[in-house]
Swiss-Prot record:
UniProt-listed InterPro entries: BH2638-like_sf, UPF0223
Disulphide bridges: none
Protein name: UPF0223 protein SMU_1141c
Origin species: Streptococcus mutans serotype c (strain ATCC 700610 / UA159)
Family from the record: Belongs to the UPF0223 family.
Signal sequence region: none
Amino acid sequence: MTKNYAYPLDLSWSTEEITSVLSFLNLVEKAYENRVEAALLLKSYQNYKTIVSSKLQEKQIDRNFERVSGYSTYRAVQAAKAKEKGFISLEN
């Protein structure tokens, strides 16, 4: 895993959309590097899904993000859904 990496962003997104996607990806990073509130991650994921509505694009972003960072958005969301309340930590 490398600390200096490019986020998988679509340059056609608005500044607000990019901010929402980055917020979600930052929370995924936080889940792996420390811990994050499950409800906060799920709320951010809902916002993310309004921007990235297709499953194909979501999978591509997850795959690209995991390739460059080592962190899976899918695994983070699944852990948050299983926990619902409290904090999750996916530290390696």
